[in-house]
Amino acid sequence: MIRILRPIFAVLVVWAFAGLGAAQQVVDKMVATVNAGVRTDLITYSDLMWQLALQPHTVLDNPTSDDLNRAMRLLIDQRLILQEAEKIPTIVPTQKELNDARDELVRNFTSPLEFQQRLQRVGMTSEKLTEIVEQRLKMEKYLDFRFRNFVVISQKEIADYYREVYTPRVQTRFPGRIVPPLEQVRGEIEKTLMEAKIESDTDAFLDTARERAEIVVLNPV
């Protein structure tokens, strides 16, 4: 359940930091709280900006309300998953997994320098980046544990997808090209169907979690 409160909660703290050589001030305010029965997590304006900074090609100067609201919805969903994930203490990323995930994140940008500059613009420290990466890995491991390990794709589903989706798609995109036989693309189709099922199961889980949780928007963005 989502409740919206008028912005009676004004300012938490004013952060001063340098961004691309120019000093900036960011007023950090409380944006929302999320409680899925484990604890109450606070989402701040800085959390939104950190989320945007980690999304390639997203503008950081004067972000639009749409961008901020997308970031807030994503963070709310992440908090819901994370609160569930932390009920399972064995879901802890290794140092290698953390390093690999961080390296993969950097590769989404044109260069390590661009990545570092974006972090500096929003005042994200190396420690905060590590915390965010660790949280993302915990969520990924939890979703794998909850959904991926139990997804079963039948041979009929694979055959149906090959006939009804894969073959027409190839014929439309590449007229005259011979469609690869089912056995050649079976693994690809199985992976596609598995990811679709996991996405559907995750969406259903989040719909239920949002209904059960206490989500309060303190300051609309």
Which residues does each PLM region occupy?
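Bacterial N-terminal signal peptides
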Residues: 7-18
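Peptidyl-prolyl cis-trans isomerase
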Residues: 25-37, 62-221
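N-terminal targeting signals for Sec/Tat export/insertion, comprising classic cleavable signal peptides
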Residues: 30-61
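Positively charged n-region of N-terminal signal peptides that target proteins for export
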Residues: 1-6
